[in-house]
Regions:
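S-adenosyl-L-methionine-dependent nucleic acid methyltransferase catalytic domains
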Residues: 1-126, 132, 136, 143, ...
Length: 251
């Protein structure tokens, strides 16, 4: 199969994977930032911080969302060091974050040995306006490479700004789910027929995008409920892509 999905702690799972097995790391780690104060950021659950009214239904919580900024930076450095070992020379990394964690995320990715390349923006057209303030309608994507990039391997021209709304209603399967249309553009940084790793896979949107764009996918998700959702979405995408007669899934 062109995808594998692992349920468990990302650091432990990545430790068992071989060197140089992926071309791109594209992931959306817990931001550990929602809330106006440090107390709110470390005491409230992910569901309390991030569930928006357009979700339309209750969504299960996820873990890893209650670190202070120093602890978050330490964890991110650890896991991105391990991810660099798995990434081929010239491979890339894309990490979602918000404005509060932008600095610590760029610090951590460089401390892990990656070459910081820049910041992309994801614009959310339906973000709620705030009276007397600027609308917080962007999240950010830090991108980096494992050493120099050989552009001849993947001669693409990709934009630095992406605009799409978060899925709403019953299409929202995860509290912080990213739009597949954005992820489909981002996975194109991975060479054709390459492999994308997402160690915070959530409901599997990165994997769905990778399969739709002809890339292989390795996903890791700690929460069992979301692992099951991701498995269903990846399997359905694979069947739609290959055709039912070409897809045989092991139990």
């Amino acid at each position: 199969l062109p995808f594998s999905l692992h349920q468990g702690d990302a650091l432990r799972v990545l430790a068992d994977l071989p060197d140089d097995c992926v071309d791109s790391v594209i992931t959306d780690p817990p931001y550990n930032s929602g809330g106006r104060t440090a107390k709110e950021r470390t005491s409230r659950t992910a569901r309390q911080k991030y569930t928006s009214a357009d979700a339309g239904h209750s969504l299960p919580d996820f873990t890893g969302e209650n670190m202070d900024q120093r602890s978050y930076g330490f964890w991110l450095t650890q896991i991105m060091t391990e991810a660099q070992r798995l990434t081929k020379v010239g491979g890339t990394a894309l990490l979602f974050t918000d404005w509060r964690q932008l600095g610590i995320t760029t610090d951590a990715i460089q401390a892990a040995g990656w070459l910081w390349r820049g910041v992309l923006a994801w614009h959310k057209p339906q973000a709620r306006p705030q009276r007397g303030r600027f609308t917080q309608n962007c999240e950010f994507i830090i991108w980096a490479s494992n050493g120099p990039i050989d552009a001849s391997r993947n001669p693409v021209y990709l934009p630095g700004l992406y605009s799409a709304s978060q899925p709403s209603g019953k299409k929202r399967r995860h509290i912080t789910q990213k739009p597949v249309e954005v992820m489909r553009e981002l996975v194109q940084i991975c060479p054709p027929d390459g492999t994308v790793l997402d160690f915070c896979a959530g409901s599997g949107s990165t994997g769905v995008a990778a399969l739709l764009e002809g890339r292989d996918f390795i996903g890791v998700e700690k929460t069992r409920h979301y692992t099951e959702i991701a498995a269903d979405r990846l399997t359905e995408t694979l069947r739609d892509t290959l055709g039912q007669e070409d897809c045989t899934l092991a139990a």
